[in-house]
C-alpha cells in the first residue's frame, strides 16, 4: 500500500545497507559500468556495489518511473512529482505507511533497514560480506550491529553431568 517512492527508498536502503542520509544522497552519476559507487557520509568510507539481481531490478524500476516525469532529476530517489526525495518527505511517507500498517514508531524505524540488511547478509553469506556492505572497518562492529537486532546465536549449552 505504500507509495512507489517510499517502496523504492526502502528497497534501496535494504539492498545497499546504508544510512537514510546516504540513500537520499545517491544520484544517477554514481551509477557507472554496472557499479553503484559512493562515499558514506558518516565515516567517508568509499563503497562500490555491483548492480546485479534485485538491486539491478530496483534501479530499472526507478528509471522507468522517473522517465514518466517532464523534468529529469539526477537524484536516484524522487517523489511522486519527480522532485528530489528529501529527508522530510521520506520521514512523512514512512511514518504514514508505518501507522497505516499498525506498527508503533518505537518498533520500526527507517534506519532499522540497515541492521536488517546486515543481519540478513550475514546469515546468507557470512560476517565478512556484511562487514563490507555496511562499511565497517572491523568485524567486531559488524557482529555488534547485526547481533543487536536478533541477539547472538548461542552455540554452546550446558550438559548435565
Predicted regions and their residues:
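Basic, Lys/Arg- and aromatic-enriched nucleic-acid-binding interface segment
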Residues: 1-20, 24, 45, 69
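Short, leucine-enriched amphipathic alpha-helices that occur as contiguous helical runs
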Residues: 6-7, 87, 91, 114-115
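Glycine-rich phosphate-binding loop
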Residues: 108
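Catalytic-site neighborhood detector that most strongly recognizes the C-terminal catalytic loop/helix
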Residues: 40-44, 127, 134-159
Amino acid at each position: 500500500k505504500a507509495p512507489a517512492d517510499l517502496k523504492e527508498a526502502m528497497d534501496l536502503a535494504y539492498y545497499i545497507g546504508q544510512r537514510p542520509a546516504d540513500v537520499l544522497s545517491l544520484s544517477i552519476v554514481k551509477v557507472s559500468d554496472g557499479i553503484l559507487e559512493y562515499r558514506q557520509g558518516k565515516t567517508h568510507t568509499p563503497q562500490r556495489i555491483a548492480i546485479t539481481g534485485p538491486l539491478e531490478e530496483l534501479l530499472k524500476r526507478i528509471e522507468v518511473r522517473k522517465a514518466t516525469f517532464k523534468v529529469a532529476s539526477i537524484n536516484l530517489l524522487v517523489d511522486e512529482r519527480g522532485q528530489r526525495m528529501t529527508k522530510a518527505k521520506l520521514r512523512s511517507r514512512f511514518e504514514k505507511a508505518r501507522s497505516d500498517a499498525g506498527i508503533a514508531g518505537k518498533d520500526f524505524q527507517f534506519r532499522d533497514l540497515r541492521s536488517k540488511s546486515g543481519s540478513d547478509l550475514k546469515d546468507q553469506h557470512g560476517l565478512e560480506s556484511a562487514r563490507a556492505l555496511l562499511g565497517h572497518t572491523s568485524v567486531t562492529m559488524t557482529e555488534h550491529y547485526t547481533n543487536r537486532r536478533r541477539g547472538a546465536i548461542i552455540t554452546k549449552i550446558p550438559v548435565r553431568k
